[in-house]
Each structure stands twice: as C-alpha cells, then as structure tokens.
C-alpha cells in the first residue's frame, strides 16, 4: 500500500495551491461572483499553467498527465472556489485532442471556454450546462455522433444564482455545430469523459469541504465565549472532527476509484458514482456544520464561509439530484449496467494490502464458510447479540481471533494491513466483531500494565477464547465509557 504522492505530484499540488491562493483569493472570487461566476484573468492564468492541456494526449500536443493529477488540481480548485468550468474544460480539451479537432489550441490557450453537455442533445437540445453562461464551445453527444457546438449570446439564457456558478440554459439545437466524429469509438470517448468528470467533480467538492472545515476550526480557536475558545466545547469540536474524517475518507475514495480503474477492478464502474455521491453529501453537510460554527455571522456575506455553503449546495445540482448517483451505482452493481471507463494514465498510489493480507483474509473466509452452519448464520447479528462462545473459541484455537498478536500469544503476528483485511471478512459474513474488539482492548492493557497474577488469571483465558470483556463507565453521568 502506498498512499503518498510522488515528488512530481507534490510539486503539481504546491504549484496550483500557490497560484490559486493568489489568483482565486476570496476578494477575486467575490468579484467574479458579481460578474456571474467567471474571472477571465484567472482563466488565462490557468491556461498558461497548462491546466487545460494536462489530460490531452501527447501526440496531440498535450501533457498526457493522469486522472489523479487532474484530481489533485481539482482539489485546489474546490478549496479556493476557483471560477469557471475548469473540470469541463480539461475534459473538453482531452476529447478535442483525441478526436483531432482544430479547436484544441483555442481551448488549451484559454482563448475560448469549453464545457460539456451531460444529456444527449438528440432528445434534449435545450439543457443547463456548467459554465454555460460563459462557454464559447460545447462538446455534446447526439446519438452516435460527438458534436462541437459554438454558442452565441442568442443561444443561451442566463439566470442569476446565489452560488454564482456560471450555469446557463443553452439551446444546442439552434446553435452552430460541427460533427467531430461518429461511431462507437467516438461515443465511448465521450462517455469515458463523463465518468472522469464525476471523479474530478468529487475531488473539487472534497477540496471545498476540507477548506470549509478548516475555516470553522480556525474560527472556533479565535472566538471566545464564557472565557474560553468555543472550540473547547465538544458540541462544536466533535462534529468538525467527524467531518474532517469524512473529508479525508472522501479524498481516499476518489484516489481508490482511480486506482481500481487502472487495475481493472470489477466494481470500478459502480464506485465512480458512489465517490461523487459521497463527496457531494459530505461537502454539503460539512459546509452547513462549518457555517453553524460561525453562528449568525456565518449567514452574513462578510464571512467567506457562506460562499462555501452556497457552492457546496449548487455544484452538483447541474447533474440533477445527487441521490440518483446511488441508483446508477446500484444498476452497475446488480443490474449489469455497463459503463465506459477512462484511461487514467499512471497511478502511483496503491491500495493493495499485500499478499500476506490476502492470504490471511482467504483463511478467515474459509474458516467462516466451514464453521457457520445455517443455525449460526441465523444467530448472526451486528450487535453483541451476535456473539457466539463456540465460534469465538474456535477462532482462538485457529489463531484467527487476535491475528495481530504474536504466535506465542495465540496470534499470527499479522501486520495491521493483514488484520484489517481479516476484519473485513467478518463483515462480509455478517459476523459481529463487538466482543472481539472490546476484549482485545482490555487484553492489550493487561498485557502492558497488568501484574503476573492478572495475566495468568485473566489474560490467558482471554487469549484462549474462554472469556470476553466489556468496558465500564468511568463517568456514568457524562456518558463516557
């Protein structure tokens, strides 16, 4: 497993972080919002950095960078609320490069703004587009054709929105258009771009959520009430801690999906909409909680947090109800729906737990298949009620109850990765780990701090699978366990 960025990726992230901290500072974001959600100077600066050519194939003059590189850039875009259809322009340029269009140079140079149409224009010629208020070019699908649409002011209708995200309702049927390509190969490229858009949007929402929580945490350290910083109150600090954990999980979710696509995992297609749904949900809820941390100030336009709240709510609505992403994932998992996946390029991060972890997981899986009779399966429950002394004892005898312990103590000396893989198998079989988890906590404390007598009378029976332990309440009135 390797979840670290390589030197080139770290440099890429740092470069865009510095650039956007300067060129998409909140004063610039507010000014762009007044202009309908677009900053021409920022757009040109992004073009000069090579942003729009990063996913263009090398043979078309692009940088041929990977999806994960684009995701890193989009995290910074979300963090700084950078204006314009940036993910859409990156993928539009990729399509133009793949299809050999002469319009590519205009897009990568920043001379023209390009975006994507999400719906087949054959059945829906009029549709809302991300960046449609400012786009010059749109790449759309029309049946088995991929179309390049040139928009004029007469082809669009713009309505002000509180989020100032630059959406526009565009009449693609009326606008001038050119057929870029036709046939399955062309439409597959377009569909792959749509899937990659979901991942890049998920990354942007993740960056937004991370910054919203950071703003709230900083304010909670500065704001005092009753003589102390409000961040010392658990009612404020614990929700923020929960959300930054979910934000971190959202980032790893996006990276893991990219890794799964690159490695050909069977569930990769279903994971794409799930990653977007998760990050959209977390961004919305994290922004709300962060805004509430500011109290009434959070609702005023003077505080930047309200900008994050508005953008978090509006960003995904261009695609429709985010809950539909769950339906799409379900169809891909259980109904055989096929998706065309993007070529992600090289992926340095690696979520593989290793051969040792796979071997231990396979052994635990075989144990449960051999041990869990229909009666035991009926007994299974996710709570303590699912504990069964006989199965608990047999796991201990097989050295699978506490595999992280040394062989001398009845375990396997398993690595944390292997222990995690083994625990996941318990979940797969619906077998509760409550008794195991709490008992292991007590066993670890006794092993480290207990007397010889306590180890003999309590620890040894624990390791043998003869007894289980629970934790008492040290502060019953406060709910601490």
What are these regions (language model features)?
Residues 1-80, 99-102, 110-111, 183, ...:
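Alpha-helical interface subdomain recognition
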Residues 81-87, 94-214, 218, 228, ...:
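FAD-binding core of flavoproteins
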């Amino acid at each position: 497993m390797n979840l670290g960025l390589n030197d080139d990726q770290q440099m890429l992230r740092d470069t865009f972080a510095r650039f956007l901290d300067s060129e998409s500072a909140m004063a610039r974001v507010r000014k762009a919002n007044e202009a309908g959600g677009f900053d021409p100077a920022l757009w040109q600066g992004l073009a000069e950095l090579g942003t729009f050519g990063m996913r263009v194939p090398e043979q078309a003059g692009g940088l041929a960078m990977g999806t994960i590189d684009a995701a890193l850039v989009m995290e910074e875009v979300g963090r700084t609320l950078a204006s314009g259809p940036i993910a859409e322009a990156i993928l539009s340029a990729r399509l133009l490069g793949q299809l050999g269009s002469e319009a590519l140079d205009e897009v990568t140079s920043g001379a023209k703004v390009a975006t994507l149409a999400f719906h087949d224009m054959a059945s829906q010629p009029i549709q809302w587009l991300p960046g449609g208020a400012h786009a010059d070019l749109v790449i759309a699908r029309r049946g088995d054709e991929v179309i390049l649409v040139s928009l004029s002011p007469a082809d669009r209708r713009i309505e002000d929105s509180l989020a100032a995200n630059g959406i526009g309702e565009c009449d693609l049927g009326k606008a001038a258009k050119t057929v870029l390509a036709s046939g399955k190969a062309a439409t597959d490229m377009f569909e792959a771009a749509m899937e990659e858009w979901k991942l890049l949007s998920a990354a942007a929402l993740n960056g937004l959520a991370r910054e919203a929580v950071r703003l709230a945490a900083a304010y909670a350290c500065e704001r005092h009430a009753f003589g102390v910083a409000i961040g010392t109150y658990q009612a404020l600090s614990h929700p923020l801690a929960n959300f930054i954990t979910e934000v971190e999980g959202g980032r790893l979710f996006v990276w893991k999906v990219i890794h799964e696509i690159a490695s050909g995992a069977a569930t990769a297609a279903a994971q794409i909409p799930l990653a977007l749904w998760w990050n959209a949900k977390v961004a919305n809820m994290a922004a709300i909680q962060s805004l509430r941390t500011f109290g009434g100030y959070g609702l005023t336009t003077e505080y930047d947090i309200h900008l994050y709240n508005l953008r978090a709510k509006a960003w995904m609505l261009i695609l429709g109800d985010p809950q539909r992403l769950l339906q799409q994932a379900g169809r891909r998992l259980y109904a055989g729906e096929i998706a065309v996946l993007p070529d992600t390029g090289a992926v340095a991060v690696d979520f593989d737990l290793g051969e040792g972890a796979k071997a231990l997981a396979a052994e635990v899986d075989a144990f449960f298949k051999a041990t869990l009779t229909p009666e035991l399966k009926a007994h299974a429950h996710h709570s303590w009620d699912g504990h069964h002394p006989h199965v608990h004892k047999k796991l201990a005898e097989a050295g699978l109850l506490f595999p992280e312990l040394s062989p001398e103590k009845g375990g396997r000396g398993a690595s944390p990765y292997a222990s995690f893989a083994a625990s996941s198998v318990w979940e797969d079989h619906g077998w509760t780990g409550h008794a195991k988890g709490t008992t292991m906590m007590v066993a670890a404390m006794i092993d480290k701090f207990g007397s010889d007598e306590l180890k003999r009378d309590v620890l040894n029976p624990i390791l043998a699978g003869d007894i289980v332990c629970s934790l008492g309440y040290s502060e019953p009135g406060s709910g601490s366990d």
